[in-house]
Design a protein with these regions (language model features):
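Short hydrophobic clusters on alpha-helical segments that form packing/core surfaces
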Residues: 12-20, 28, 62, 66, ...
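Amphipathic alpha-helical packing segments from all-alpha helical-bundle domains
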Residues: 107-134, 140-144, 171-174
Length: 174
């Protein structure tokens, strides 16, 4: 009797995440996930009632991944500039995920809910030397302005309309 293979939720999530990371949500289906894993669609539907439940799990994983990519970038020592550069770099290195979450809006949220008003971003900025004496409202306004500029650049980079050149992008963001 052949050994049965166990397809876990972790395997399904990781495989689905990699599909979305490479090609976006448009190609995500139980059949494509199963093909990638090398199984039938049955294990996928054993773990998830429907594709919407699976998509919600992928969104959680992807947003945490994208936020980590963006927030871990440090080049200039200026927190706001580094956040902007990290955001544009994320669009360059992860274009399918960037488009899905920040251009196609697969999560149906306002972008201001994700980035400028993010408590994590405000906290990071408040802890930086250059923002110690700035009110929370002024800080949120500065973040929003920088983010709008960075988002425009990142969108152009993600769709291939602007070549990713970090030095030029840094000059624009300054």
């Amino acid at each position: 009797m052949p050994k049965s293979t166990t397809i876990t939720q972790e395997i399904i999530i990781e495989t689905a995440f990699e599909i979305v990371r490479k090609e976006g949500f448009a190609v995500l289906s139980a059949r494509n996930i199963a093909k990638q894993i090398g199984c039938s669609t049955q294990p996928i539907y054993w773990c998830y009632k429907n594709m919407e439940d699976l998509k919600a799990e992928i969104c959680k994983k992807a947003l945490a991944f994208l936020q980590n990519v963006m927030l871990s970038y440090s080049k200039t020592g200026n927190t706001l500039l580094d956040l902007g550069l990290g955001y544009v770099r994320m669009a360059h290195t992860e274009p399918a995920l960037f488009k899905a979450f920040y251009m196609d809006n697969v999560t149906n949220v306002k972008l201001t809910d994700i980035f400028p008003e993010s408590e994590r971003v405000v906290e990071i900025m408040k802890n930086s030397e250059e923002c110690q004496n700035i009110s929370d409202q002024e800080l949120k306004n500065d973040i929003a302005k920088g983010w709008m500029l960075a988002h425009g650049i990142a969108s152009l980079v993600a769709v291939g309309m602007l070549v990713y050149d970090e030095d030029k992008i840094l000059e624009i963001l300054k």
